[in-house]
Design a protein with these regions (language model features):
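Extracellular/periplasmic catalytic domains that process cell-envelope and extracellular macromolecules
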Residues: 14-17, 31, 81-84, 102-104, ...
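Solvent-exposed, polar/charged alpha-helical surfaces in well-ordered, non-transmembrane soluble domains
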Residues: 13, 38, 42, 60, ...
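Solvent-exposed loop/turn segments at secondary-structure junctions
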Residues: 4-7, 27-32, 94-97, 115-118, ...
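A conserved helix-loop-strand patch within extracytoplasmic ligand-binding domains
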Residues: 1-46
Length: 165
């Protein structure tokens, strides 16, 4: 979100307040945006005693506050960071870290909601490719963004046993 948190956004319920402009990718075209949608849905279910109608109303109110619905996560990050649109960006942790650390540490801050989804995308390593490119690191290979997050000290990522080889 914008530095200083001028709209006082601390959790999912703050995103449905009037006057809050949300940026998130379209869950119909972005895999990551589906996790955003499901995290909001899970929060709404939990805080409404599993009442699906109330959860649907919550998610509908959230998406009414979405100013730009980009087709993908990086597009939403660009809309928020480069175009300056929106009060808050709903994003995967790596996109939030990219915005804060690489594109404007003095302009953004990260707020972690009380509830979210733990998504653990799989990573495949093609030995011939990593050997040829010299990208194999420390007995295993991780995506560059994961390494960036680890260096920043903000990553809560856990490595699965299969990723520790």
């Amino acid at each position: 979100m914008r530095k200083g948190n001028p709209k006082q956004i601390h959790d999912w319920n703050d995103l449905i307040k009037p006057g809050v402009s949300v940026i998130t990718p379209n869950p119909k075209s972005s895999g990551g945006a589906r996790w955003n949608y499901l995290a909001a849905w899970g929060y709404a279910l939990h805080h409404n005693n599993n009442d699906q109608a109330k959860a649907q109303d919550f998610v509908r109110a959230l998406y009414k506050n979405v100013e730009v619905l980009d087709s993908g996560a990086r597009g939403s990050t660009n809309t928020f960071v480069e175009r300056g649109i929106g009060d808050v960006l709903i994003a995967w942790e790596n996109e939030a870290l990219l915005a804060a650390n690489e594109l404007g540490k003095d302009k953004f801050e990260i707020v972690t909601p009380s509830e979210s989804i733990l998504a653990e995308p799989t990573v495949s390593v093609v030995d011939k490719v990593v050997e040829k490119k010299g990208t194999k690191r420390g007995g295993g290979s991780l995506p560059e963004i994961s390494l960036l997050a680890r260096r920043s000290g903000n990553c809560r990522e856990k490595l699965l046993p299969s990723a520790r080889r």
